[in-house]
Amino acid sequence: MPVFREEQRYPRWVYLLAAAAFFGALFAEAVETLSSGGGGPYEWIPGALAGTLGILVINLLFMVTEVTRTELVVTMGRFFPLYRRRVALADILEVRAVTYRPLRDAGGWGIRWGRFEGSRCAFLNARGDRGVFLNLRNGKRLIIGSQNAEALAEAVSREAGLSAQV
C-alpha cells in the first residue's frame, strides 16, 4: 500500500506532436499504397508497425511515482509499464527536493542520464523542473521529477528514516 503516489502526464503539446507524427505516417503510407496501384500481400505491415509504435509512444507518456514502506517505485507507462525503476529505501543515503534544468542537466524529459551538481546522475521525469535528488548507497545518483517535490521528499525520508532537506 503506497504512502505516497503521484501520477504525471507529459505536457499536452507532446501528445499532439505524437498524434501528428502517427497520422502523418499513416497518411504517407496510404498515399504510397494508392500511388503504386494497390497493395500486395504485405502492404499492411508498415501501417501495423506505425499503429503499434503509436500505441507504445502514447503509453510511455505517463509516469507514476509511488513510495511504499520498503521501496520507491517509478513506472513509465500507463496501460502496460515499459520501464520500472525500484529503489529500496534502505539504499538511500540522502534525500532532498531540488530545482534542476531539464534541458541543460538531463537533455530533456523522460528516462535520461546527465550531470547534476558536477556529477553523473540519472533522471526520471515527465515535466517541470522540480524533483527529488537521491544519493544511493552504491554511489549512484538519481533525480525523480515531481510536481510535488517537497511531499515526495518528505515521504521518502520519513519511510527511510532520514531527514529531508527541502
Identify the role of each PLM range.
Residues 1-39, 139-141, 154-155, 166:
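N-terminal membrane-targeting/pre-transmembrane regions
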Residues 38-50:
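Hydrophobic alpha-helical transmembrane segments
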Residues 49-64:
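Transmembrane alpha-helices and immediately adjacent membrane-cytoplasm interface residues
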Residues 65-72:
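Alpha-helical transmembrane signal-anchor/signal-peptide segments
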Residues 66, 86, 143-146:
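Short aromatic/basic micro-patch
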Residues 75-140:
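Non-transmembrane, membrane-adjacent beta-strand/coil modules in membrane-associated proteins
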Residues 82, 98, 152-154, 163-166:
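A composition-biased, non-transmembrane "mature-region" signal
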Residues 131-138, 142-157:
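Terminal membrane-proximal soluble interaction domains of membrane-associated proteins
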